[in-house]
């Protein structure tokens, strides 16, 4: 069974990130003066054009890169590197092709030598994504949606406090993508951790997020923090859903464009 979670407070305080260009003396201002606070139980969607710093924020929170200026902290403690309490799921499943579904899911536990309750935790993850009868299959035998579910629970088995999702559904077809949106929301609702997701889809951001952070580029910055005050599951055709969608479009200077 999942362990009881402590409340988490993630803060970015006046964070800027600058990348030097190898081929010239110029620099890229990926983020400039970003300040935001997120807490347990929130599902925060990051949306904006390519190059606005969405994935940079995830990498900062994951501890893969440090800020150039400012501070990133969890419960007041500065992030100074990766932690099993902050799990990152990428767009592509990146499963180990030589391991079965079951072995892929248990991989991080095996590496850490975490034997206590291992079998129960793996069984819980398989049940959560409905793949019990595929436990002995290999990644090449799975559909795209099945592989992404395995990648998701391979991260979740560490029972982290913060779940980071970097366009986790971008490579899937539309039908599988919608099913996976519900899968992720169901898991998030059970675990009650903080989830932070990067997406290029405004509909996905509104459908899944309790908050949507809208970003612009040059330099990367947050220009709007929109609370989505709707119960789950959400109706994509409802007037309120369309209103939220149009508000985000307006923030991104696409007001007046309607599908």
What residue ranges belong to the model's regions?
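The feature captures the beta-strand-to-loop junction immediately N-terminal to the Walker
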Residues: 47-49
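Helix-to-loop junction immediately C-terminal to a conserved catalytic motif
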Residues: 62
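Conserved ABC transporter NBD signature motif
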Residues: 70-82
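Short helical segment in ABC ATPase nucleotide-binding domains corresponding to the A-loop/adjacent helical element
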Residues: 102-110, 119, 227
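Conserved ABC ATPase "signature" region
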Residues: 113-134, 186
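Conserved ABC ATPase signature
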Residues: 138-142, 146
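A short, proline-enriched helix->beta-strand linker immediately N-terminal to the Walker B motif
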Residues: 157-161
């Amino acid at each position: 069974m999942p362990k009881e979670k402590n409340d988490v407070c993630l803060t970015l305080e006046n964070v800027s990130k600058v990348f030097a260009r190898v081929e010239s003396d110029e620099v890229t201002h990926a983020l400039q003066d970003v300040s935001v606070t997120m807490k347990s139980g929130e599902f925060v969607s990051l949306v904006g054009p390519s190059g606005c710093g969405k994935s940079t924020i995830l990498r900062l929170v994951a501890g893969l890169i440090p800020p150039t200026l400012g501070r990133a902290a969890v419960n007041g403690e500065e992030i100074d590197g990766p932690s099993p309490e902050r799990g990152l799921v990428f767009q592509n499943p990146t499963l180990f092709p030589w391991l079965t579904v079951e072995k892929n899911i248990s991989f991080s536990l095996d590496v850490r030598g975490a034997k206590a309750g291992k079998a129960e935790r793996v069984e819980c993850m398989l049940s959560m994504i409905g793949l019990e009868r595929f436990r002995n299959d290999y990644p090449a035998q799975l559909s795209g949606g099945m592989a992404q579910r395995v990648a998701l629970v391979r991260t979740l088995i560490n029972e982290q406090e913060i779940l980071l999702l970097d366009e986790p559904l971008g490579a899937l077809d539309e039908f599988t993508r919608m099913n996976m949106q519900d899968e992720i929301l169901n898991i998030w609702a059970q675990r009650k951790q903080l989830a932070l997701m990067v997406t290029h889809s405004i509909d996905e951001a509104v459908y899944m997020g309790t908050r949507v952070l809208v970003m612009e580029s040059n330099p990367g910055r947050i220009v709007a923090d929109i609370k989505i005050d709707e119960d789950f599951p959400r109706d994509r055709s409802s007037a309120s859903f369309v209103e939220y969608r149009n508000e985000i479009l307006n923030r991104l200077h696409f007001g007046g464009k309607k599908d």
